């Protein structure tokens, strides 16, 4: 999950295969992290099977979180996450060889920490997502 205020990755799950349990785990973490949000929360996703499960949609309703979904086959509706995945692939995947699932998973986890804490963005005034969040929390 990404916070569109500062493009920070708030929660995620990495698994060898897609699973409902992994999606629910990331959802619960995103709910916990955003619980004190002063404005209405909107969780946006593509139309993948996991985001249409009753357990998922009911959990959003319980928390009064608005569910937004991309139009069918329209990657532009989810362009912010598509951009993040493009950066991730470009910066840690292409040209690299990972010898195990664990090695790839560790690289992705390290990249997310780097992306949130150190990777500056022009749109955030040349700050990292975490720096931008901290600056505006103090204001």
Ranges and model annotations:
Residues 1-139:
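Charged DNA-binding/catalytic regions of mobile-element recombinases
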């Amino acid at each position: 999950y990404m916070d569109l205020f500062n493009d920070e990755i708030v929660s995620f799950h990495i698994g060898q295969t897609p699973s409902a349990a992994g999606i629910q785990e990331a959802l619960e973490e995103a709910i916990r992290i955003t619980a004190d949000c002063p404005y209405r929360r909107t969780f946006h996703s593509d139309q993948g099977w996991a985001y249409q499960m009753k357990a998922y949609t009911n959990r959003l309703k319980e928390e009064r979180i608005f569910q937004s979904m991309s139009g069918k086959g329209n990657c532009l509706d989810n362009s912010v996450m598509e951009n993040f995945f493009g950066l991730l692939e470009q910066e840690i995947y292409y040209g690299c060889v990972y010898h195990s699932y664990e090695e790839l998973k560790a690289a992705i986890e390290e990249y997310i920490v780097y992306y949130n804490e150190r990777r500056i963005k022009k749109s955030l005034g040349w700050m990292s997502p975490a720096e931008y969040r901290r600056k505006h929390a103090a204001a």
